[in-house]
Amino acid sequence: MEGPEITFAEAMLDNGRFGARTVRFETGRIAQQAQGAVAAYLDEETMLLSATSASKHPKDNFDFFPLTVDVEERSYAAGKIPGSFFRREGRPSTEAILVCRLIDRPLRPSFVDGLRNEVQIVVTVLSIAPDEFYDALAINAASASTQISGLPFSGPIAGVRLALIPGNGAHEDQWVAFPKASQLEEAVFDLIVVGRVLTNEDGTEGDVAIMMVEAEATEGSWNLIQGGAVKPNEEVVAQGLEAAKPFIRQLVGAQAALAKQSAKAIADYPVFLPYSQETYDSVAALAYDELVNVYQIADKVERQNADDALKERVKAALAEKAQAGALDAEALTQFSAAYKSVSKVVMRGRVLREGVRIDGRGLTDIRPLDAEVQIIPRVHGSAVFQRGETQILGVTTLNMLKMEQQIDSLSPVTKKRYLHHYNFPPYSTGETGRVGSPKRREIGHGFLAERALVPVLPSREEFPYAIRQVSEALSSNGSTSMGSVCASTLSLLNAGVPLRAPVAGIAMGLISDVIDGETRYAALTDILGAEDALGDMDFKVAGTSEFVTAIQLDTKLDGIPSSVLASALKQAKDARTTILSVLDAAIDAPDEMAPTAPRVISVQIPVDKIGELIGPKGKTINAIQDETGADISIDEDGTVYIGAVDGPSAEAARAQVNVIANPTNPEVGEQFLGTVVKNAAFGAFVSLLPGKDGLLHISEVRKLAGGKRVESVDDVLSIGQKILVEITKIDDRGKLSLAPVLADEAETHGHDAASEGPTEG
């Protein structure tokens, strides 16, 4: 029996002194019933399967393209058995959902307009090497399987992850393609760029057009920059976009080579144009002039009400024309799309010709800003940030490091101490809708805000807390995610988190059109929701006054010239500087921690003392926690974290930990208020401090009975009884002999028997 015909193509990406990475695409061996199936390999050890399928018939009454992207993480890929009760994979991890979004965002605009057949792309992680990320490889796999599927898809598109690793004087700084997780620890910036290769009019290859960008400064970037590494400012980020182009070109070439051998012919899928030219002309004739006035109303609600009223009038007029036979009956089903298209022309034309936006602002103007902290009682930190009609509430909660998130996924990242959760309730846009578990968009927005702030967080040693930041979008009219970054900076400072620098974010938009035979671009600062919906780009940039901490770019175009993006980056910095001044006016330094926040301190103990501190079955550590009311957690390196609701409780626990793990040798003559823990025929054992017991011999017990003979220690002392004792002898093995301190002796020594702990005799 003959086996399947297997074809492959590969790209070798040269990383200079860091070696090379090989990306290989293979088809024909597995998943042969899918319209397109490609196995993508990274250096032969990481393997993904991407399968693209399409329904046979278009969906009726759909006015959008029904594309679904799913990422399936298989535990066997990393040699693991799932940790769930049923020992099988459940719902997608947060990391898998984020990769779904990375694939969907550049692929969706690459399908032909008007396609209504359901298309599903399933990427399954079959094998992953330790220290590797699979997200950028998944973008390429999804594009390759779609490219050979016979669907009307204007690919290939390619994605590459780059890390900027400083040369530290010995070498030049270098952008490394497909870096390992360990290499990211040495990097100051992490960048995922997706693009396509344009074709010139003469059929030759043109420039690489950028379709999507995800980027962030790394967790270690601050320390690296302080040590002399390059700051990832706007110029450096623009260089990174250029550095990605050769790698994208190679990956696109490999996909094209595979498609040349294996692609199916483009099938004849029905395409449903959103409207006919006749419908568009009719709507434009009825609505254009009034829309010009509507899109000069600054207030969102007032503008929406005027727009809705006009829309109803135009629709009624269109219905009359259709009823009279002057217009095709399908015009009514095409009306909404045609009306939106006319609205887009009105808005874009005014911006490009006059440089004036919907609310009357210029291209670089920011809406009114407002910032306020400490607005919610009892929480550890809170703030409200408002930019125009976008209003975000930020709330910070602090806890011990043992509350950090443990991540069970195929990502090299296994735990996170900073969690950022974003909520977008329906009332934020004046609507009704479902509330409950977060949707993919909310997860993505929260992760973007998280990435923006991680580079400026204090280290675990400087601030030993787990931090949960929640952003509530209370009102939305453009870029709630960047508003979340600003509100979070305020809230974290209000909670007493010593940020290394404040961070602000701004959303940039892009309008492009052919005016007088020339393609013009206009970058918009601080876009409205309508400018996002009717524009060509959503470009979010967050950072400090010195460097960029996070970027997210989405576009509805086939690609954007990198020169346009570089200009938008510089424009975003000016806006960011303005916002940072407003944040600084609201709070310019960390506040004192709230009384309701836990106090966490740390103690370093020898590793060989960890077992002694824990005690048999946790007896010792539990006793300290019960006695002091503190929570204690221990890291493998001997770092002990102590958390309590107040400082004295934490200090009491630290003192007891030090007695056990960092002990000072007890001396004869020291006095302790101890606790009787065991009675024997020859005396009583008294606990002086956790892990330190001494023997009160029966001959010494007699002193407590006035010198009379004692038949049983139980007649004089009971378990749990407090007794003031003095160390009288320490033998060669460290065993302690005790004697009771009688009332007259205690008075002589001036000892307050109400306080526990050692006292000098």
Curated annotation (Swiss-Prot):
Q: Which residues form the KH domain?
A: 598-657
UniProt cross-references to InterPro entries, sorted A to Z? ExoRNase_PH_dom1, ExoRNase_PH_dom2_sf, GPSI/PNP, KH_dom, KH_dom_type_1, KH_dom_type_1_sf, NA-bd_OB-fold, PNPase
Q: Which domain of life is it from?
A: Bacteria
Enzyme Commission number(s): 2.7.7.8
Listed transmembrane segments: none
What's the cofactor? Answer: Mg(2+)
Alphabetical list of Pfam families matching this protein: KH_1 (PF00013), PNPase (PF03726), RNase_PH (PF01138), S1 (PF00575)
One Gene Ontology molecular-function label? 3'-5'-RNA exonuclease activity
Q: Does the keyword Nucleotidyltransferase apply?
A: yes
Question: In the UniProt record, which is one GO cellular component term?
Answer: cytosol
Which keywords has UniProt assigned to this entry?
Cytoplasm, Magnesium, Metal-binding, Nucleotidyltransferase, RNA-binding, Transferase
Q: Name one GO biological process term.
A: RNA processing
Catalyzed reactions per annotation: RNA(n+1) + phosphate = RNA(n) + a ribonucleoside 5'-diphosphate
Q: Which family does it belong to?
A: Belongs to the polyribonucleotide nucleotidyltransferase family.
Primary role: Involved in mRNA degradation. Catalyzes the phosphorolysis of single-stranded polyribonucleotides processively in the 3'- to 5'-direction.
Protein name, as recorded: Polyribonucleotide nucleotidyltransferase
Organism per entry: Leifsonia xyli subsp. xyli (strain CTCB07)
Q: In the UniProt record, what gene is named as encoding this protein?
A: pnp
